[in-house]
Design a protein with these regions (language model features):
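N-terminal Rossmann-like dinucleotide-binding module
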Residues: 1-56
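Beta-loop-alpha module in the N-terminal Rossmann-like domain of NAD(P)-dependent dehydrogenases
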Residues: 44-47, 56-102
Length: 105
């Protein structure tokens, strides 16, 4: 089965919801088209990012969202920041050839 490396930007409520959704994907899509591997989560500070990584099951945390966009192993950039911060991140992710997911509330 194909695996997809996920980088999630933002670590608030929607990040938690998306993280739970990645974990539950095989329960809703059977057979699942692939498995999400939660690689990196970004938040405003290193401390917050590392805490979010531990709480939400990501391998690592970073305070720089560009670390996710620039990582050649990341397949999907999931944007869970406030809406007014989506554009710059989405454009950078698209230019890097990433698949883009986002939370819109």
């Amino acid at each position: 089965m194909k695996t997809y490396q996920v980088g999630l930007i933002g670590a608030g409520f929607m990040a938690k919801a998306h993280s739970i959704a990645y974990d539950g994907m095989p329960m809703f899509f059977w057979p699942a088209p692939g498995m999400a591997v939660k690689k990196t989560i970004a938040d405003l500070t290193e401390e917050c990012a590392k805490d979010a990584a531990q709480r939400l099951g990501f391998r690592q945390g970073t305070a720089n969202w560009r670390d996710i966009v620039d990582d050649p192993e990341i397949d999907i950039v999931d944007i869970c920041t406030p809406n007014n911060a989506h554009c710059e991140i989405a454009v950078a992710a698209a230019e890097a050839g990433k698949q883009i997911g986002r939370a819109h509330v």
